[in-house]
UniProtKB/Swiss-Prot annotation:
Molecular function GO labels: ATP binding; GTP binding
Physiological role: Displays ATPase and GTPase activities.
Source organism per UniProt: Desulfitobacterium hafniense (strain Y51)
Positions annotated to bind GTP: 64-67
Lineage of the organism: Bacteria, Bacillati, Bacillota, Clostridia, Eubacteriales
Protein name: Nucleotide-binding protein DSY4845
Amino acid sequence: MLSKQVRLLVITGLSGAGKTQALQSLEDQGYFCVDNLPPSLILKFAELCTQSQGKVTRAAIVCDLRGGEFFSSLAEALGDLHREGFHYEILFLEASDEVLVGRYKESRRRHPLSPSGGILEGIQMERQMLTELRGVAHKIMDTSNLSSQQLRHQVAESFGNEQASGHLAVSVVSFGFKYAIPLDVDLLIDVRFLPNPFYVAELRPLTGEHPQVQDYIFSNPVAQEFVDKYLGLLEFILPYYVKEGKRHLVIGVGCTGGQHRSVAIAERIGLFLQERSYMMSVKHRDAARNRKGDKSK
């Protein structure tokens, strides 16, 4: 049956237990995510996923008190999913009363079941109302002693695929400093200290993707030593980014105009990442701009 091709994860549980962080983690794993979906729309949502021509194979939704219809209709919606042949799992998040009270006080938000105050009373009321739903959950996570980052990592380990949870998506972008540093860069490399092919007439119209330009740059011992040491640094730090739960890293490589040196170094970094099976992309932001006639490199 077509509908069985979509894996649906329903996230629910106590208010303040970390459902938003869990959903964000799943989004990083490639899930199509919807927050605060009313139970009456769950079946329709699942049907739409099956009509995506394979673009949506995993989806996650959060159903909680904000949905308005409350959980009395959630059981009915899940029953409809089962009858229609959809595979779904329930992730139930909870935490101790003490921890939840502390989180509400820290955020200065009101509990949805106690709009006039009385945080603890609202928590206890909600816990009682969710007893039956908790009993049918496929997985229960107690977030009392978890930081947001630890929760995201635990969700990724439980519901992410092996490739997404074990690898980091790395974007390498070369650029020219005179056109400004990309705003989303995490790691920045300035390679303006390397020999500049711009001052070699036959290399000037080429970019750092061309073998002649790369040979010129890496024939310099300093350039080769720099690349070797930087790749060694990446070899060391990337696994720690993965362990910490980071899913996307942007490495910016800049030279004056973004045509020669930064492009060549970015290409070498991209090859390194590809050889180690990281999800990666290389973009040369300013190389084409310079080839159109900008004389300052």
